[in-house]
């Protein structure tokens, strides 16, 4: 169950809206949120017995490990605020078999949608480059949500919240969410 489509339809009819995203430990309200994409990348190799004929195998896990090291280089957290995290890896069945399957799940976050698109393009290019020599790769973006940056367009709403907070006797604090 998702409220995304419903909220999107309401947004088309609204001038302003307050999103009640859970606050931060210091009680700050969230004024901006990074965009996010979730990727699944599936590596298929060739199974072989690790003792009798390992040379006939093509390790999906080894290909996924190389890909993971490369995709990790796409992040620029301290500069553009982008992060790329290979957070889930599933592969292999038993330790005496060259694994023919490995699946990765990637979380990508960006402050600007254009930076996110550049990283998504790079993930696809790295997946394509990982193919060959008995390894097949399929990269699929499972979900995408746009960044919600702080801007002059949402400043009036933030000022309304600031004023409401002052009327209640406190100063609103603001944070940017990842």
What would you call each of these model-derived segments?
Residues 1-34:
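Acidic/histidine-rich catalytic neighborhood of metal-dependent amide-processing enzymes
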Residues 22-27, 31, 37-42, 46-178:
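Metal-dependent amide/peptide-bond hydrolase catalytic core
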């Amino acid at each position: 169950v998702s409220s995304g489509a419903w909220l999107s339809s309401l947004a088309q009819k609204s001038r302003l809206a307050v999103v009640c995203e859970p606050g931060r430990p210091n009680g700050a309200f969230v004024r901006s949120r990074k965009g996010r994409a979730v990727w699944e990348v599936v590596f298929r190799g060739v199974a072989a017995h690790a003792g009798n004929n390992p040379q006939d195998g093509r390790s999906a896990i080894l290909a996924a490990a190389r890909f993971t090291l490369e995709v990790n280089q796409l992040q620029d957290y301290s500069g553009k605020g982008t992060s790329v995290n290979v957070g889930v890896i599933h592969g292999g069945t038993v330790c005496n078999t060259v694994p023919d399957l490995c699946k990765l799940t990637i979380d990508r976050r960006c402050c600007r949608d254009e930076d996110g698109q550049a990283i998504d393009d790079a993930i696809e290019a790295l997946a394509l480059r990982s193919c060959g020599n008995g390894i097949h790769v399929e990269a699929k973006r499972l979900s995408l949500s746009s960044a919600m940056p702080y801007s002059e367009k949402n400043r009036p709403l933030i000022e309304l919240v600031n004023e409401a907070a002052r009327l209640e006797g406190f100063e609103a604090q603001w944070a940017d969410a990842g």
